[in-house]
Every structure is written in structure tokens, then in C-alpha cells.
Amino acid sequence: IYNFLYLTNQGIDIVRIDAVPYIWKELGTTCRNLKQVYTIVRMMRMIAEIVCPGVLLLGEVVMEPEKVVPYFGTVEKPECHMFYNVTTMATTWNSIATGDIRLLKKQMDIVNQLPKQYVFLNYLRCHDDIGWGLDYETMRPWGIKEIPHKRYLNDYFTGKSRI
């Protein structure tokens, strides 16, 4: 909390919380989605609302948008203000490489069905690599196989192949 308050006092407007599901560690667990995570993020939101109400909490959760929903909290107990839309980033690059927007459209339709107060930050690149964690369950009936498809994407973006 000290660093959080220090940074907000320096004038930052957005605090990025990296790898939200893993911010609480406990031996003997996967350290993912432990109940303490929600308590910590809720506490940060409460502090922000009292001490620095103009500051937004931007979370990073590498999951599909519909699985990120619990990290927004509830109307009564809000947590993060917004989240990176990691899935759409990878799906956008997939659409560029393949010329196929079906998966991107499906994901945008899902996001558009979520409550309007759930805000996602769409972006095209970050400091991490692009993980090809695409929705292969949806893509399978379209004749797309995961391993060859990932190989194609890597080859495409390294200049080894084209559509």
C-alpha cells in the first residue's frame, strides 16, 4: 500500500495491477484466484476512493473477458475499474494473419453483452509476448487445428509465410 500511495502522490492517474489472480501466494496451492486476491484488490479500491478518488485501477488478468468479470467486484463492492482485454489483442493479430474475423466477432459479441460498467482496455501490443491462447474450441469446427495454427501464426509474423 505504501508504494501505491507513493505513486498516486506523484500524480499518476492509473495504477496497473499485474497478474491479479496471483497477487496472493499460499504454499500448497496454485496461488491462482485465492479469496485473498479479491480482498486485496477491494482494499486498494477503497483506499483509492478515499485518498485519491481520481485514480483508476487497471488490472491484468490473462483470461477471456467473461472470466475476468469477478475481478470487477460488485456494484456494492467494486474492485478494479478496468482490465486489459488480453484475448482480443491475440485474436486481432490472428485476424490479421488469417484474414478471418469470425473469432474476433464472436469475442466482441461476448464483450458487448457484458454490463456496460465493465470496461476493457483494448490494445495491440505490450511488453509480454503474444500468447496464442485463442479459443480453439470454437475454431475446431472451422477446421483449425491448434498446433499447426500456432505454427502458422508464428511463421506469418516472423515473415516465413503469408496468407
State what each model feature region is.
Residues 1-163:
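Active-site and adjacent substrate-binding regions of carbohydrate-active enzymes
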